[in-house]
Amino acid sequence: MQVLPPGSTGGPSRLFILRPVATTLLMAAILLAGIIGYRFLPVAALPEVDYPTIQVVTLYPGASPDVMTSAVTAPLERQFGQMSGLKQMSSQSSGGASVVTLQFQLTLPLDVAEQEVQAAINAATNLLPSDLPNPPIYSKVNPADPPIMTLAVTSNAMPMTQVEDMVETRVAQKISQVSGVGLVTLAGGQRPAVRVKLNAQAIAALGLTSETVRTAITGANVNSAKGSLDGPERAVTLSANDQMQSADEYRKLIIAYQNGAPVRLGDVATVEQGAENSWLGAWANQAPAIVMNVQRQPGANIIATADSIRQMLPQLTESLPKSVKVTVLSDRTTNIRASVRDTQFELMLAIALVVMIIYLFLRNIPATIIPGVAVPLSLIGTFAVMVFLDFSINNLTLMALTIATGFVVDDAIVVIENISRYIEKGEKPLAAALKGAGEIGFTIISLTFSLIAVLIPLLFMGDIVGRLFREFAVTLAVAILISAVVSLTLTPMMCARMLSQQSLRKQNRFSRACERMFDRVIASYGRGLAKVLNHPWLTLSVAFATLLLSVMLWIVIPKGFFPVQDNGIIQGTLQAPQSSSYASMAQRQRQVAERILQDPAVQSLTTFVGVDGANPTLNSARLQINLKPLDARDDRVQQVISRLQTAVATIPGVALYLQPTQDLTIDTQVSRTQYQFTLQATTLDALSHWVPKLQNALQSLPQLSEVSSDWQDRGLAAWVNVDRDSASRLGISMADVDNALYNAFGQRLISTIYTQANQYRVVLEHNTASTPGLAALETIRLTSRDGGTVPLSAIARIEQRFAPLSINHLDQFPVTTFSFNVPEGYSLGDAVQAILDTEKTLALPADITTQFQGSTLAFQAALGSTVWLIVAAVVAMYIVLGVLYESFIHPITILSTLPTAGVGALLALIIAGSELDIIAIIGIILLIGIVKKNAIMMIDFALAAEREQGMSPRDAIFQACLLRFRPILMTTLAALLGALPLMLSTGVGAELRRPLGIAMVGGLLVSQVLTLFTTPVIYLLFDRLSLYVKSRFPRHKEEA
């Protein structure tokens, strides 16, 4: 047993140094817990930060946007507006469809929100039209969130109606049952139905009306209870042939008698098996298809949900005929997995680089092994805590662990370097470990808690940005905390067992060359430091200039919100003139699809035309462009978008808007471009006055591109102006007029066919092939009081007007959304400021309000809190350091190093052409924690030298700088190399990781050079200031 010198207590490390078995087993337990925890951690793109969002869709075929707004949307909005926890309510009412999107506060559980929505729908039921084909349907899904998976179902042998029927009953329902799936939509609208197309001339010749036909059909097809007979011996259930199942049966239906002869439906109408809505269509790579979009519930794990769907797909497709093919066109998890794999590789690369730099400085394998064990142990142990906190393996937590490699190795390096110094002086390894660990223990604690203090403000950030970075901050803090524990336990214990004078002195040619190089560097630094200390005011001027430069760079640097990712999927909107029909839009999408599929980067394409819950108007079409994997194409997504828009620009009468899908979805509406700005008024008339003015002003701004709005008030409308007196004289009510028009032109769902597996509709309409356009109104006939028929033209005048194609509300008031992108050379911050300046110039009245939406609104909130976030980080660190040092002065000396980090980070971002977004801001905040480590190591040793050796402040700080130069250089290079893989990232998701790496590498490079000289000067300045205060106020001295 070694005899320990007096004072070799080892501090908190003593017990662990003297009990190596217990220490080893404790570390093994941490390692095992981390390995087990890793197996249970889910994989995701980003932390779960989704707002609880519910979409309510109501379909009312044939209803105009005005009718949908007043009769459907408004009653629902009034009930929804009374729900607690509602953050925002938006609605879109178009021809035949009402979509209300409800976004709740982050703190409200989705299941609670669902209960409130269901109760509100129930309360509004009595206020809704009595002839709604279906009640409002709600889905726990954000409509702006892109599908996690898109499947195309095609067949070259079966009609699309049969294909959709099979997909709906055999595939879609099963996928809907998967945990995490919020909504499965079948785009294409080929739901089977019996279509009855009335011949207006035929029914008029027979003195019949469409209402007569409708009544006959609804009365002939019923499916209701008929009772049972209960006799003395047996019970008998009653049934009847009260249903008609096929078009042939309906064709033979007798609807009236003329002169004793039956008039069958087939005599006055074309009856056929068709689709429920003939104005819906979807195509996959230009082939007619049923496109199945699978959307997840807010908060659901996308990887687990997609894996479950993939597992069941083979079994589901086996139940389909061989002529029906199911193709997975897009799977967002493919890019998510690739991004996570790339980040994991960068993590391993960072570990390798850090270990390499350690060996370069220590030039000793045993000494390199010790931190080589500490780094993975600290990182793996973090996984155990992540499991208990319900975190996931995602880009941000992996980025935190990658950055942590440079942090966690710092503590081990400081301990090893200090213990090695004593061993080289001749101390026994055990005594050196006890003495070195005891001496450095306070420094480790200071480094750890001051660094964690920097992360504390991130935990208190509000709203979605705070939720986004909570996992990042906590993961990093846990890794740093475990690192401190390892450095005070395992590291000194291993030093006592693995290091010796012989091993440290054993050198080869490489070691001797490195040693000579380091000696020369330290000597050069010493000479430079001596000169700096002799000219303190020049150094202070440099420090002050650095502070001013930081402020200037902060003001001028382009600012953004979140990096635009290349996930390999592009969402698009095709816009045509407002009066465009379904047939013309189908033709236009074919032309556009042909151009898009010619691009070498495009792998597949789906297009959709028609009005449903996802597409508001007939003059717009939805596109989803799936790109080839990143390693199989030459261009990034923004270059592909520019190329596609150029290719389509020559097609007359269309405008194509494209934007890449993102993992972070804040919006609640599918937008044409990345950013949104709303104009809201109390009336539609006020909007119609100000929308053109604001749109023209925004389109003239160079900071904005592709400016458009969803305001469409030039749709063609036929106004039926009924002479109520004439109608009343003939016994015709307005209800009769509405019914006649609805029967003829509304694709009216008049009856339901029930089967064992599904329900199908009977659709009534006029056959307008021979009388297209407004001429079809001349064929409408109404039944008068005496039983005769009267043409509509006898009581009404037809006027052609303009009407809105859709009416949008935000929190129950009319609103228009302006969509825009930011052109190259400008930032989102530039665009936001330009819009605000334009708004002031227009001098909008008080009843007109504006607001940014989605990511632009989040950008404003994040930008407003950024400065306070950095101030909070500095204040938190000052408090921690003040408590640790029991001093008001020394924390200021340490914090004086921070402007150097800001200058380096901001300069690096500007040189790299990167914006100051929230990822880069997190990097700057982390730099605050890293850079101050240099000052802590210098000041700790300087104070100890003054206290224990009686040195003057100048001699103490000079010696401390030289003694700590090597560990400072080593720890800084370790942190720099830990961030270097992120800066040089090129794989999937690199856009997300690169700003963090750029900010940290730039900040470390500049701060490393400056703080080595500015810190000792500022230390001496504050020392003189302290002496001056004590001399002026002797009471302070006495109390001290």
UniProtKB/Swiss-Prot annotation:
Predominant location? membrane
* Presence of keyword Cell membrane: yes
Q: Enumerate the UniProt keywords alphabetically.
A: Cell inner membrane, Cell membrane, Membrane, Transmembrane, Transmembrane helix, Transport
Question: Where are its TM segments located?
Answer: 25-45, 347-367, 369-389, 396-416, 440-460, 472-492, 537-557, 863-883, 888-908, 910-930, 968-988, 998-1018
Q: Which GO terms describe its molecular function?
A: xenobiotic transmembrane transporter activity
Can the keyword Transmembrane helix be found in this entry's annotation? yes
The way this protein sits in the membrane is described as:
Multi-pass membrane protein
Instruction: Return the Pfam families for the record.
Output: ACR_tran
Subcellular localization? Cell inner membrane
- GO annotations of cellular component type: plasma membrane
In terms of InterPro entries, this protein maps to:
AcrB_DN_DC_subdom, Acrflvin-R, Multidrug-R_MdtB
* HAMAP family (UniProt xref): MdtB
NCBIfam families (UniProt xref): PRK10503.1 (NF007798), RND_permease_2 (NF033617)
Subunit (UniProt): Part of a tripartite efflux system composed of MdtA, MdtB and MdtC. MdtB forms a heteromultimer with MdtC.
The Swiss-Prot or TrEMBL record describes its family as follows: Belongs to the resistance-nodulation-cell division (RND) (TC 2.A.6) family. MdtB subfamily.
Q: What is this protein called?
A: Multidrug resistance protein MdtB
